[in-house]
Amino acid sequence: MKLTLEPAPRCLHEYVSQLLEDWQPECLSCEYSHGGSSRPSLHDLFDLELENSRSPSPLLCDWCAEADSESTISTETDVGFTLNTPPVSPLPSYSTSPASIPEDMLLCLEEMPTFDDGDEVRSATTSFESRREKNFDPHVGSFFGCLRCAYYQEQGENSICGLCYLKALAEGKIF
């Protein structure tokens, strides 16, 4: 493998100008002068004429001009388009007061001793506190977590919810 080193350019401006000429895309015509006396201004480089915006630019190749004309046609069709939306109706007010909701309905399920008899998920012998005292091992199937996790673990699944997983991870029970 042979490496060739080019000497450092004497004038950075001339070097960059030469690179721009070498790498110039074929569809753009650059009128940048090499002389250091008259540098183009930003207005000269990015001069936009709004009067002739519908005609394709003479600086673009055929494919670019066609794509540009398609984009202007699609925006011209949207100019007169307005969307009529129906007015938003106000939200209905509910006559429930905070006093009508019992306080035990606002408690977290983890703090409740048991469900009602009709909705019993776990028995009195398998209380939530006794499950929490056992060490968590997902491969053995010991119970851990909230009531939802306990229900599925009683069904034979070795799963816990995301919140209980994070709690167990924070307590160091999952490595």
From Swiss-Prot:
GO molecular function: zinc ion binding
Record motif LXCXE motif, interaction with host RB1, residues: 106-110
Keywords attached to this entry: Activator, Early protein, G1/S host cell cycle checkpoint dysregulation by virus, Host nucleus, Host-virus interaction, Inhibition of host innate immune response by virus, Inhibition of host interferon signaling pathway by virus, Inhibition of host STAT1 by virus, Interferon antiviral system evasion, Metal-binding, Modulation of host cell cycle by virus, Transcription, Transcription regulation, Viral immunoevasion, Zinc, Zinc-finger
Subcellular location, principal: host cell
Zinc fingers (unnamed) by residue: 146-164
Chain intervals for the UniProt region annotation (Interaction with RB1 in competition with E2F1): 40-48
GO cellular component: host cell nucleus
One BP term from GO: symbiont-mediated suppression of host type I interferon-mediated signaling pathway
UniProt-annotated location(s): Host nucleus
Annotated coiled-coil segments of the chain: none
Domain of life according to the entry: Viruses
Quaternary assembly: Interacts with host UBE2I; this interaction interferes with polySUMOylation. Interacts with host RB1; this interaction induces the aberrant dissociation of RB1-E2F1 complex thereby disrupting the activity of RB1 and activating E2F1-regulated genes. Interacts with host ATF7; the interaction enhances ATF7-mediated viral transactivation activity which requires the zinc binding domains of both proteins.
Role this protein plays: Plays a role in viral genome replication by driving entry of quiescent cells into the cell cycle. Stimulation of progression from G1 to S phase allows the virus to efficiently use the cellular DNA replicating machinery to achieve viral genome replication. E1A protein has both transforming and trans-activating activities. Induces the disassembly of the E2F1 transcription factor from RB1 by direct competition for the same binding site on RB1, with subsequent transcriptional activation of E2F1-regulated S-phase genes and of the E2 region of the adenoviral genome.
Record-stated family: Belongs to the adenoviridae E1A protein family.
Name listed for the protein in its UniProt record: Early E1A protein
